[in-house]
A protein has these predicted regions:
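Non-catalytic structural scaffold of enzyme domains
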Residues: 1-249
Length: 249
């Protein structure tokens, strides 16, 4: 969707969220959403599985009606879950995520709600985000931690045929993950499916689409060092970006 205007806010000063409590994740996420609303955003996507798991519902139900009922805050878990029954043939799915995402049980609850016949196994991978954040995703340490968690989840449920990368950092480890997986296992990365779900959402809600500006601009905001964020973003995007440092607490 390149024609739309985007503001990306990375709360890098307080990341990772994965090990933090529900209350702290909610507070941080609420502050971030309010900041984006103050910047003029009409629709905010929580492009973080931990924030989607621990803060989305409270923000939607408690905060949004007070801020502006016409605006929307959406997450990344439901668009992922909706596809699981089509992708998994064995109906045994594994979720790779942060401690926060896995302990919240959000994936398991959502999958069981939609597809009661499916079996869901979660695996917390607490070192994966720091490896990516520190640009060590090609290191021997990454080899060790990737193999360790994949072996553990597949030993826990040998019938798993689909593994979900339940964190937006994890695609940078995807090639390393693929080398550790046995044949016959589908690796599910969220990005393109969440984007497709957003396109579908805007088609079904033309009133929201009409509220979105469409000049093709993109701003990047961070709560930490702009230079450090720019270096990390260039790894994800394969090109340099201009970044603004802000405070949201």
């Amino acid at each position: 969707m390149p024609g739309y205007d985007y503001i990306y806010l990375g709360d890098n000063a307080r990341s990772p969220y994965g090990t933090r409590s529900f209350e702290v994740v909610y507070r941080f996420t609420r502050q971030a959403v309010e900041t984006l609303f103050n910047e003029g955003c009409q629709l905010v996507i929580l492009a973080c599985n931990t924030a989607s798991a621990k803060a989305l519902r409270t923000i939607q139900q408690r905060d949004l009606p007070q801020w502006d009922p016409a605006r929307r805050v959406l997450g990344v878990i439901r668009p992922t879950v909706e596809l699981m029954d089509k992708i998994s043939k064995s109906k045994h799915v594994g979720i790779l995520g942060t401690n926060g995402t896995i302990t919240s049980g959000s994936y398991s609850l959502e999958i069981k709600k939609m597809f009661p016949h499916m079996t869901v196994t979660g695996e917390a991978c607490p070192m994966w985000v720091p490896l990516v954040e520190n640009n060590e995703f090609a290191s021997p340490g990454a080899d060790y931690f990737v193999r360790k968690h994949l072996e553990h989840i597949l030993a826990t449920d040998p019938e798993i045929d689909t593994l979900v990368l339940g964190c937006t950092h994890y695609p940078l480890l995807i090639e390393k993950i693929k080398t550790c997986l046995p044949a016959g296992i589908t690796l599910f990365s969220q990005g393109e499916y969440v984007a497709a779900s957003l396109v579908d959402y805007l088609h079904r809600h033309p009133e929201m689409d009409a509220r979105l500006t469409k000049q093709g601009s993109c701003r990047f905001l961070t709560t930490e060092s702009a230079a450090k964020f720019s270096d990390a973003a260039s790894v994800f995007l394969s090109h340099p970006v201009e970044v603004e440092q802000i405070s949201i607490d």
